[in-house]
């Protein structure tokens, strides 16, 4: 009997306790349009407010919200949505009834008024770091520091662009590019052309992914740079027009007008932009603009440029358009298009070179003068179609992307090279005795196409676990047709030995899957993933009648472990394996000749480069970011310049060199990186980055075993100051010490940018003046191999000044479609958790 009484007592107690909890639910709607407001902030507070926020959730795409398992007590419900009046409602304890939930029904939020009267101000973080990427957001101050999107890329932490415009990411070559998350199957030279033709106002930001997850292509041993083009974030119609003028000296100057137009309503988000640029470049005739020493055995040769002169003109157009349409509350259709034209109708290059030998370096015994003219044009087009479908209230979704891109380029050049012997013993008369002349007329046409289709599936299993999977197929083709004619008795005739056609095809099919889970009250996060890729390639060299086929399969594991000591104190470890596939031209065995002393060729036996990457990183208060990275690359691809030997079946000068790519063995790289990003005061922002990089290279070359190491140091400082009366100042400084690439070494370089600007008429009109300056007096490089030592010096460019004017027009009001939370944040907030 006592046992029965005890059981009944416990049962009644449990029932009584369970009756103290219930769910609170409702819907959030726009009172004027009678439409659901998705992702509204819904907050429960204790009425006394002594403990602050009790629960927080976000409304779903139907405007519905629910707080689960809420204790019986006096509460206050607050609902906030940008552009709408804040809603408050008391929920007294007496509203709680046994066994019943509290249904608040439909809650109508009042719109604040005319869109023109709504002003939303929020300071955007310039540097953001999350799970996989570093994001550098581009605001007006940064965009006005430079004249094009290429120079804007120089400001990104971790990106190194040297004086020769070669790019590295976190100390490594092999960088893959995306635009708005879409892969760009273009070589770096083509991407440079595209960025130089784009106005900086078109760029919303650059995302740096040094450890991309498995949903990304495995291409890029250094990582991925995602170019984020601007999308409209304001309701209604708005836009901007502007023009920028730049001048380096009397030979280098140009201008760039641009315009943007945007439109947003409850269904559409549309944005489009156009820019035009025209640029004149040149260098006056000046002595010693470049000097090259060559040691081969005991022979030392000096090539000295005595009066190099350059002149060129180029112009380009750039268009971009994006649109997304909400089919319903669960699905969205998107379209994007980018088109660009870059033309150089005239280019002139006069390159007289004196040749002398040890010990009489300044008494030339021979010389040559290369006079060339060039006309070129290129255009590129990229199209993208996307569809996203939300599958359930947990934000499970499936997405599909279809992408197409193409690039065409044509270059026509005329070259006349005269070779001289020493005659009178002084540099004024050395060009009087021609012993041989060569003339070439060349046309180089290159066409590339790429099409890809992918499907991605995202499934939150619960609050702690999510699953991702997908597949992608990609087809790429390129055709390079090189036609050469040689001058003979005053007439240009076909030169079959120097003409070339190379066709290349590549197909990559991939599958991936990833699982993320969180433990210990969501403090510990674990992500594991695998990506499988099958690659099929075919290269056809028409002149040699050779065909090269390669088929290989790779799997790419990926691991991420992170632990949050506090919300703003996180430690993470990443591992990834990535690949760098040879570009089509690097596989072409055709030998290209630029002069008697310089040749280049490809390597059909080139293998893909693989890289294991480990990273340990820490973020503190979203201000201080520290990382230690180690990578080991096998079959690393590098271009080597070595003496041209007798294995090539044509006559050549004993001073000739040839450049070609090889798999050099392996390399190890260790990098310590520390970044600081903080608003020191309300109007002063500082971003600083610095560290040290160690690299070690081992390679087996035909005539030498290479074992070299190098320590490099780097730093950058980026600061912005808002002054009274809407003046603003900004400055950027970058330094990198000497760098090594296998058998080559280059000196350090420095870069400085400064900007002053002012806004008028409620920030609608902006004026900006900036200066960009390479602080190196000369750039130097050195190549050592076997018994050859090659040293080069080149003059640095003078500072470039840029002045820009921008006028904004239309309505600027944050649209609710842009206020959607990221999936990860939404999953964490939805449902409010349990007590």
Question: Which residues fall in each region the model found?
Answer:
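Short, acidic, small-residue-rich periplasmic hinge/interaction motif at the N-terminus
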Residues: 29, 41-45, 78-82, 99-142, ...
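Short, acidic Ser/Thr/Gly-rich low-complexity loop/linker segments typical of extracellular
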Residues: 48-64
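N-terminal periplasmic accessory domains that precede
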Residues: 101, 105-107, 149-152, 191-194, ...
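Short acidic/polar hinge/loop motifs at secondary-structure boundaries
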Residues: 149, 155, 182-210
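Extracytoplasmic beta-strand/coil segments of soluble accessory domains associated
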Residues: 150-187
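Surface-exposed extracellular loop regions of Gram-negative outer-membrane beta-barrel proteins
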Residues: 228-245, 284, 288-289, 305, ...
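Outer membrane beta-barrel strand-and-loop segments of large Gram-negative receptors
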Residues: 441, 450-454, 493-502, 607, ...
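Outer-membrane beta-barrel signature, preferentially recognizing the C-terminal barrel domain
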Residues: 500-505, 579-634, 657-670, 792, ...
């Amino acid at each position: 009997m006592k046992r029965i009484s005890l059981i009944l007592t416990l049962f009644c107690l449990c029932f009584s306790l369970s009756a103290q909890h219930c769910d609170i639910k409702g819907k959030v709607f726009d009172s004027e349009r009678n439409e659901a407001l998705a992702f509204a902030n819904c907050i429960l507070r204790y009425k006394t407010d002594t403990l602050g926020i009790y629960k927080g959730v976000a409304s779903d795409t139907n405007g519905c919200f629910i707080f689960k398992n809420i204790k019986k007590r006096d509460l206050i419900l607050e609902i906030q949505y940008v552009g709408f009046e804040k809603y408050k409602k008391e929920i007294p304890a007496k509203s709680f009834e046994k066994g019943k939930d509290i249904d608040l029904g439909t809650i109508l939020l009042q719109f604040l008024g005319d869109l023109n009267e709504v002003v939303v101000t929020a300071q955007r973080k310039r540097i953001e770091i999350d799970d996989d990427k570093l994001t550098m957001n581009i605001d007006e101050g940064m965009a006005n520091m430079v004249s094009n999107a290429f120079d804007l890329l120089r400001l990104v932490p971790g990106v190194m662009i040297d004086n020769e415009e070669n790019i590295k990411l976190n100390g490594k070559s092999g960088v893959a590019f995306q635009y708005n998350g879409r892969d760009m199957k273009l070589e770096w030279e083509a991407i440079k052309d595209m960025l130089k033709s784009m106005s900086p106002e078109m760029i919303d930001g650059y995302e740096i992914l040094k450890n991309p997850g498995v949903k990304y292509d495995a291409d890029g041993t250094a990582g991925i740079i995602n170019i984020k083009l601007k999308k409209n974030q304001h309701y209604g119609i708005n836009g901007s027009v502007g023009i920028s003028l730049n001048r380096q000296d009397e030979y280098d100057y140009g201008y760039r007008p641009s315009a943007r137009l945007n439109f947003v309503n409850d269904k559409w988000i549309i944005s489009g932009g156009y820019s035009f640029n025209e640029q004149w470049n040149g260098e006056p005739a000046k002595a010693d603009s470049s000097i090259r020493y060559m040691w081969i055995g005991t022979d030392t040769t000096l090539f000295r440029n005595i009066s190099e002169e350059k002149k060129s003109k180029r112009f380009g157009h750039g268009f971009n358009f994006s649109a997304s349409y909400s089919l319903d509350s669960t699905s969205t259709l998107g379209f994007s298009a980018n088109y660009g034209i870059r033309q150089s109708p005239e280019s002139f290059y006069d390159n007289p070179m004196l040749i002398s030998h040890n010990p009489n370096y300044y008494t030339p015994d021979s010389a040559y003068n290369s006079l060339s003219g060039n006309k070129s044009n290129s255009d590129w087009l990229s199209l993208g179609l996307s569809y996203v479908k939300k599958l359930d209230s947990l934000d499970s979704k499936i997405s599909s992307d279809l992408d197409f891109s193409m690039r065409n380029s044509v270059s026509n050049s005329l070259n006349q090279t005269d070779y001289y012997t020493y005659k009178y013993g002084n540099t004024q008369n050395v060009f009087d005795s021609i012993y041989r002349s060569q003339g070439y007329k060349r046309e180089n046409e290159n066409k590339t196409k790429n099409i890809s289709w992918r499907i991605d599936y995202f499934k939150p299993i619960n609050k702690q676990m999510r699953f991702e999977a997908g597949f992608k197929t990609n087809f790429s083709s390129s055709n390079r047709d090189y036609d050469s004619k040689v001058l003979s008795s005053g007439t240009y005739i076909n030169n079959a030995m120097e003409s070339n056609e190379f066709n290349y095809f590549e197909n990559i099919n991939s599958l991936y899957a990833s699982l993320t889970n969180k433990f210990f009250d969501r403090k510990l996060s674990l992500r594991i993933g695998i990506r499988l890729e099958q690659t099929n390639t075919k290269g056809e060299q028409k002149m040699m009648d050779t065909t090269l086929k390669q088929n290989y399969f790779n799997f790419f594991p990926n691991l991420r472990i992170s632990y949050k000591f506090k919300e703003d104190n996180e430690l993470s470890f990443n591992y990834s394996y990535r690949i760098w596939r040879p570009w089509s031209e690097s596989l072409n065995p055709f030998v290209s000749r630029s002069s008697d002393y310089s040749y280049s060729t490809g390597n059909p036996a080139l293998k893909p480069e693989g890289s294991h990457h480990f990273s340990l990183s820490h973020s503190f208060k979203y201000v201080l970011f520290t990382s230690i990275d180690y990578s080991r690359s096998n079959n690393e691809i590098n271009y080597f310049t070595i003496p041209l030997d007798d294995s090539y079946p044509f006559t050549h000068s004993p001073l000739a060199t040839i450049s070609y790519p090889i798999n050099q063995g392996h390399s190890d790289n260790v990098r310590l990186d520390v970044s600081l990003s903080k608003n020191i005061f309300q109007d002063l922002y500082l971003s600083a980055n610095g560290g040290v990089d160690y690299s070690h290279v081992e390679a087996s070359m035909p005539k030498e075993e290479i074992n070299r190491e190098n320590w490099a140091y780097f730093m950058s400082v980026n600061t912005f100051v808002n002054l009274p009366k809407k003046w603003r100042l900004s400055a950027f400084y970058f330094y990198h010490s000497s760098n090594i690439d296998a058998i080559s070494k280059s000196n350090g370089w420095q870069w400085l940018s400064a900007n002053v600007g002012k806004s008028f008429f409620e920030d609608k009109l902006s004026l900006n003046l900036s200066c960009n300056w390479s602080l190196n007096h000369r750039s130097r490089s050195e190549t050592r191999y076997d018994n050859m030592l090659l040293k080069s010096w080149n003059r640095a460019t003078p500072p470039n000044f840029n002045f820009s004017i921008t006028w904004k027009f239309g309505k600027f009001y944050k649209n609710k479609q842009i206020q959607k939370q990221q999936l990860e944040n939404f999953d964490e907030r939805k449902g409010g958790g349990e007590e």
